[in-house]
Amino acid sequence: MLNEPLQPQVAATSVILGLGKTGLSSARFLASRGFSIAVMDSRKSPPGLAALQEQNPDAVLRLGGFDAALIAEAEQLVVSPGVALSEPAILAARARGIPVVGDIELFASYVKAPVIGITGSNGKSTVTSLLEAMARQAGRQVLAGGNLGTPALELLEKPVPDLYILELSSFQLETTYTLDAVAACVLNISPDHMDRYPDLDAYCQAKARIYRGTGTMVINADDFRVASLVQPHRPCLRFTLGMPAVDEYGLQERAGETWLVRGHERLLSARRLPLAGRHNLANALAALALGEAVGLPRAAMLSALQAFSGLPHRCEWLAEVNGVRWYNDSKGTNVGATVAAIEGIPCQGKLILIAGGVGKGADFSPLSKPLIQRARAVVLMGQDASRLEAVLASGPPLYRVNSMDEAVVKANVLAQSGDCVLLSPACASFDMYADFEARGQAFRQAVREILSC
């Protein structure tokens, strides 16, 4: 796990590309360790600018583009997740032999406690937060962050815990080489970020980098892409939504009741989990397997499971009025997440889905079958509403709107008693909102307004 950190060199510079939350944490971390830093961003006014100027007034700053001459003199290039590695400046740096790393690689060079790594197309934040709750219930000192919440490098500024839990994106893993996680999991693979990757295989290969270490591999046996990543002679724990093998986690149906099990041993009835949806049963099983891999007591893990109600904007129940239930799944930013929400939300009647935004080059066709089976109607908005409309034309009725307020009004008119209204856009939010949280908050507010009338 422990690697030899790069030492500052006289007159040498660490160049940081991207001045968002991660880039700012990289700048702060390197400057505090004596590195000379330069920070660049293609934007003229990036979100971390004011904080950088306050915290690191001596940092060299280049905005509105990347300074190729300065990059050519760098001792290392620290690339933020939002910057594609196909950028000409990065390709040129690699051709010169300049190390190209990210914040997680820096973290791996300095970390002094065991690390659990969690990635996947969907469920990362839920499993990270659930596992953190399990570790705390077990009395462990734990710090969680990475792609979720606190940047990884900021965790290193705090007292060393018993355990780090990191949510890791494919973009972060692209520039990570030496992280040796004591346990790691790719939760699932479904198409996402196809505007950044040439194909699904390239995206899968980026996710697979989380297994580069020597620790326990936690494997989703139901996902053939994940299952194919198993390495011989590595410790491995599997989970499935079917009946598991003797040393795996899974589900058992008994007398009309679903149980979480390990092998043939029943652990907990699914009815006792506050989390909604079958996809969250997979998240629970993954967390149990990861917890077992690092020695968390089962009783503590099961106790935490029964108390964990989930995260905002992830299949979040908002209200029930006139027999209609409203769910906020704004974090459903890709097709796989939305399919899981459509199939997993408990609904006596039909679904009214609100979807649309920036599709990131995704194939929307996997939405068709579950919508035909479960939806009364689909309300579309945002940049790629026309693409969604073309793909879903043979399914339930489609309605186009121009705003979240209009979407909620239309859904309220369409819904019947027993139905569920689900915001799960299958798209990113940045055509209309700063992030998925802002989109989810707009949905909440629109629901409040329509229900207060």
From Swiss-Prot:
Origin superkingdom: Bacteria
Positions bound to ATP: G120, S121, N122, G123, K124, S125, T126
GO cellular component: cytoplasm
Keyword annotations of the record: ATP-binding, Cell cycle, Cell division, Cell shape, Cell wall biogenesis/degradation, Cytoplasm, Ligase, Nucleotide-binding, Peptidoglycan synthesis
Entry annotated with the keyword Glycoprotein: no
GO annotation terms (biological process): cell division; cell wall organization; peptidoglycan biosynthetic process; regulation of cell shape
Broadest EC class assigned to this enzyme: ligase
Pathway: Cell wall biogenesis; peptidoglycan biosynthesis
Catalytic activity, reaction form: UDP-N-acetyl-alpha-D-muramoyl-L-alanine + D-glutamate + ATP = UDP-N-acetyl-alpha-D-muramoyl-L-alanyl-D-glutamate + ADP + phosphate + H(+)
The keyword Methyltransferase is annotated on this UniProt entry: no
Record-listed E.C. numbers: 6.3.2.9
InterPro entries: Mur-like_cat_sf (IPR036565), Mur_ligase_C (IPR004101), Mur_ligase_C_dom_sf (IPR036615), Mur_ligase_cen (IPR013221), MurD (IPR005762)
Annotated GO MF terms: ATP binding; UDP-N-acetylmuramoylalanine-D-glutamate ligase activity
Compartment list: Cytoplasm
One of the Pfam families matching this protein, by short name: MurD-like_N
Sequence similarity: Belongs to the MurCDEF family.
Described function: Cell wall formation. Catalyzes the addition of glutamate to the nucleotide precursor UDP-N-acetylmuramoyl-L-alanine (UMA).
UniProt-listed HAMAP family: MurD
Protein name per Swiss-Prot or TrEMBL: UDP-N-acetylmuramoylalanine--D-glutamate ligase
Taxonomic lineage: Bacteria, Pseudomonadati, Pseudomonadota, Gammaproteobacteria, Chromatiales
